[in-house]
Amino acid sequence: KEPEPNLPLFAFIARSIQVLNIMEEGKANFHLCFLLQLCSFLGFSPNMETYRPGYFFDMLNGIFSPSRPIHTYTLDAREAEVFARLTRMDFNNLRHFKFNRGERNAILDRILTYYRLHQPDISELRSPEILRAIFD
């Protein structure tokens, strides 16, 4: 729902589709990488400068914190570490990130929760089931 053309966003999406079409390895993680990179174009990237090992991730405020926030939109220290690693994933290295189906589904659920928190106009998506089927 952009009021004017967003050329960087369009270029990112076009490039992503091109990469997916030629990708030979790592396709199972493509959707995770795409969604995390898309955050920056939509204006709600996690603040990685606040990350430290053992910190919680406050999904509501997009920051890492040494103490658990009082709301429930939090990743514990282990999940926060995985999330921090994921933010370093790009289309060139995503084949090196190994997750089983359950881990990938849990990560997708967390990313979609993060999206809903920062884009309240996003209704419940039906696409997670499609993404799980395609990238499994």
Predicted regions and their residues:
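Non-catalytic alpha-helical scaffolds and adjoining flexible linkers that form interface surfaces
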Residues: 1-136
